[in-house]
Amino acid sequence: MFNKKIIFVFILTFVIVMIQGCYSFTGGSAPSHLKSMTIQNVNDNSGFGNPQYREILTQTIIDLFLNDNTYEIVDLSGDARLSIVINSIREAPVSVSPGELETERKVEISCEVEFYDNVKKNVIMKKNISSYDIYQVSESQQGRDNAIRNALSQLADDVLLGVISGW
């Protein structure tokens, strides 16, 4: 009986140690040979008509990477290059009140992200991502702008996480 308890405790301890060794917050890591990165200005192919949004996304991504400190951010000739294109910014009604009046709208932004290895001359990751936020129609233009800014912020967070975790 005593030997069974010792064996059980040993097996349980072994399993716990093995599971801990497999656990990771990021799911991967950045390639070790890449030390610096160039972040290109975001291109906006959405046709939405507000160049401010691409500038906001560009600056938010730069700020996140500077704070993260995984890569040295350089203007030219980085070991890696991050390119982002806003493909679409769409709006759609979310909820309608009695009398068929819109009460909430959804803003969805879709982007194509490419992370390129300038050292090995290959694409590390190319992915389409999207984010959205919902705003009250009664908030008019201010609500819409805030929803777009929130969606852009979430996209920037997703890009950072994707790049440093190896997507």
Model-predicted regions and their roles:
Residues 1-10:
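Bacterial N-terminal signal peptides that target proteins for export
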Residues 2, 17-63, 68-70, 75-78, ...:
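A structural "domain/chain start" motif
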Residues 10-11, 60:
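A periodicity- and composition-biased signal for non-globular, repetitive helical segments
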Residues 25, 67-72, 79-124, 128, ...:
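Surface-exposed short loop/turn segments
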Residues 48-59, 102, 106, 141-154:
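Soluble non-cytosolic domains of exported or imported proteins
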Residues 147-167:
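Compositionally biased, intrinsically disordered linkers/stalks adjacent to structured regions
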